[in-house]
Amino acid sequence: MRKLVIPKYYGRPSIGLALFGCTNRPFYHVCVFPDRALGRRYEGNILEQVGTFDPLPNQKNEKLVALNFGRLKYWIGERNAHISVPVLELLGLSGLFPIHPKSFIRAKDNRALIADQQLKVAAEAAEAEKVAQEQASTGAAATSHPQ
């Protein structure tokens, strides 16, 4: 498709995530597209790949990101490329840009989710301990009073 259209008639280039990988195993390439409107799943629409992002945690619970900062600075600075929100989040976490506000919101939600899970586990443990104490007290009462 890129060869059919004259490049000077494209709009502003866009930096975004292109989905690669398999079913239930996403893998993203951080790519430069000639325009925001063109599809992100077609390899023919990619001008340049400037990084990769693996969203699934590995054995050490890390999400791997590889970025070519030199090429990103070129596309952002000299070519005035538009940057998608997910890429802005990655660039904020990598230190090239300030941290995106959406990252703070996501971290707050994750902390609240973990706190809720810990409260549920503590409540279940307290309930189990209470049941065990009741069983122990009824069992002790039954053995101390022979009939």
From Swiss-Prot:
Keyword Kinase: no
Keywords carried by this UniProt record: Mitochondrion, Ribonucleoprotein, Ribosomal protein
GO MF terms, alphabetically ordered: structural constituent of ribosome
A GO term from the CC aspect: mitochondrial small ribosomal subunit
InterPro entries: Ribosomal_bS16, Ribosomal_bS16_dom_sf
A single GO BP: mitochondrial translation
Cell compartments where the protein resides: Mitochondrion
SUPFAM superfamilies named in the record: Ribosomal protein S16 (SSF54565)
UniProt keyword Ribosomal protein present: yes
Chief location bin: mitochondrion
Pfam families referenced in this protein's UniProt entry, alphabetically: Ribosomal_S16 (PF00886)
PANTHER family: 30S RIBOSOMAL PROTEIN S16 (PTHR12919), SMALL RIBOSOMAL SUBUNIT PROTEIN BS16M (PTHR12919:SF20)
Assembly notes: Component of the mitochondrial ribosome small subunit (28S) which comprises a 12S rRNA and about 30 distinct proteins.
Similarity annotation: Belongs to the bacterial ribosomal protein bS16 family.
Entry protein name: Small ribosomal subunit protein bS16m
